[in-house]
Amino acid sequence: MREIVHLQTGQCGNQIGAAFWQTISGEHGLDSNGVYNGTSELQLERMSVYFNEASGNKYVPRAVLVDLEPGTMDAVRAGPFGQLFRPDNFVFGQSGAGNNWAKGHYTEGAELVDQVLDVVRREAEGCDCLQGFQITHSLGGGTGAGMGTLLISKIREEFPDRMMATFSVVPSPKVSDTVVEPYNATLSVHQLVENSDETFCIDNEALYDICMRTLKLSNPSYGDLNYLVSAVMSGVTTCLRFPGQLNSDLRKLAVNMVPFPRLHFFMVGFAPLTSRGAHSFRAVSVPELTQQMFDPKNMMAASDFRNGRYLTCSAIFRGKVAMKEVEDQMRNVQNKNSSYFVEWIPNNIQTALCAIPPRDLKMSSTFIGNSTSIQELFKRVGEQFTAMFRRKAFLHWYTGEGMDEMEFTEAESNMNDLVSEYQQYQDAGIDEEEEEYEEEAPVDEPLE
């Protein structure tokens, strides 16, 4: 089966990762020790995508847990599903990265990276046909951002033809954990643009908004946020984990979603939104799911797609859903909102179906969109970056670890380029292109 190796780095990555494994273990009928006691053949059919089968009907996640300090790892190990993971797959340092990207990427992280790669290699060798890697991390810190991107580039070197998907928590406009977040995030995006095949952008602020506005939680905890993220991750990976009519793998997803190699940053959404522990007793219908899924309030990244246009998007429906109904709804959305879709990619909504719904829901849908409005997110981080970098504030923390100012300048301009590329395709129409060609045709002068 087409296996995926999962890595989680840093505090954020490990917490999201732990929530993800808890969610999919439940969906596949595994208890907290990885013992199968499910009811459906379908749960077992593609179990091997994420789990290794060990002796005694026990399944072990193909996961590598990485951090530069032992704290979060201990918490995961002590958590409800801590016994699920293979003990050798916990790789951690003692020093911490102190929210410093340079420590994660160049000094502390670089010392630990070979140990991690050994574990990754061992996991990859245990696969029949590895399709790729997925990594959960945040872009604002030191370990997830710095060491996470280091791992991505190292894995890229060693497995150049395998897919690399990242679930990246991007800094949010209002909620900031550290002052140097814009630095860390910009340096990370600089890496992701080059080395990742698909990046699912998740944003704490958007998650807070969903918790407060939609789920009416007065003070959401990180547990509530991680629950939302794990719902989306479970949805995005559904097609990989269960047999379905329209199945996809990481590569098919990328082929359908990425029209230009650098523009692989996706917004994600999920419907119906329910809070942790609350079951939705209301029956949901396909039209409702579709409407909710395309609602900007449901997006888990703080950028509003109405300020841009969709290059491509993909919807994954789960549960007992009629294919015909889904296709009608999708066509409906596209016709009604045609101004939000670029007209030079016809039929740019792709749908997939899976018969197995998430736990406690009759049906659900997950949305993945490649929208030019994601540039708002990069713009915002870029502006904060420039404000600090112009004064060279906090730079000594990075140069002290051996970084060069030049690298900051490069990262800044790469991010600005990314923003203008999104803008360029947002403005592009069909007719403009043709006019340009007509103008260029009659030029016969020899080139100097």
Curated annotation (Swiss-Prot):
Dimer of alpha and beta chains. A typical microtubule is a hollow water-filled tube with an outer diameter of 25 nm and an inner diameter of 15 nM. Alpha-beta heterodimers associate head-to-tail to form protofilaments running lengthwise along the microtubule wall with the beta-tubulin subunit facing the microtubule plus end conferring a structural polarity. Microtubules usually have 13 protofilaments but different protofilament numbers can be found in some organisms and specialized cells. InterPro entries: Beta-tubulin_BS, Beta_tubulin, Tub_FtsZ_C, Tubulin, Tubulin/FtsZ-like_C, Tubulin/FtsZ_2-layer-sand-dom, Tubulin/FtsZ_GTPase_sf, Tubulin_C. GO terms for cellular component: cytoplasm; microtubule. Belongs to the tubulin family. GO terms for biological process: microtubule-based process. It comes from Epichloe coenophiala (Tall fescue endophyte fungus). Mg(2+) binds at residue 69. Residues 426-448 are annotated as: Disordered. Its cofactor is Mg(2+). It is found in: Cytoplasm, Cytoskeleton. This is Tubulin beta chain. It comes from the Eukaryota. PROSITE patterns: TUBULIN, TUBULIN_B_AUTOREG. Residues 429-448 have a biased composition (Acidic residues). It holds the Pfam family Tubulin.
